[in-house]
């Protein structure tokens, strides 16, 4: 009986260790691929095994923003530095039923615009460009960031 229990535990451990996320499987496939590197993107996965928002082509200046499921949200282009703003903006735009929902304004490089304004309320505030974290309180009207 004791040996049977050990075998079951080992089988469960081995089976659990083999389960990989879609991103991890995709990364392995691309790592093994023989396609030329400039044409190939080896996806980066986060600690949970989901796709990281910023995905860049190896040995290239071209990057794109992807959602957690591996769907590209932007075309690959040079100069993309961050994707949190683009991911947040696209998520809000997919949920069209939220009248009055705040949609962040993003720069061409994917960072948050320094000044964010809520179209429904007329309030504006300054944010940290990479994280989107507020650095000023919202005020009515525009302000200098």
UniProtKB/Swiss-Prot annotation:
Disulfide pairings: 23-45, 56-63, 85-106, 117-124, 126-145
Q: Which domain of life is it from?
A: Eukaryota
Q: Under which name does UniProt file this protein?
A: U20-hexatoxin-Hi1a
**Major location category of this protein:** secreted
Q: What is the lineage of its organism?
A: Eukaryota, Metazoa, Ecdysozoa, Arthropoda, Chelicerata
Q: Which InterPro entries match?
A: Dev_reg/Prot_inhib, Thyroglobulin_1, Thyroglobulin_1_sf
Q: What does this protein do?
A: Cysteine proteinase inhibitor.
- Asked if the keyword DNA damage belongs to this entry, the reply reads no
Cite the GO molecular-function annotations of the record.
cysteine-type endopeptidase inhibitor activity
Instruction: List the source organism.
Output: Hadronyche infensa (Fraser island funnel-web spider)
Stretches of the chain forming a coiled coil according to its record: none
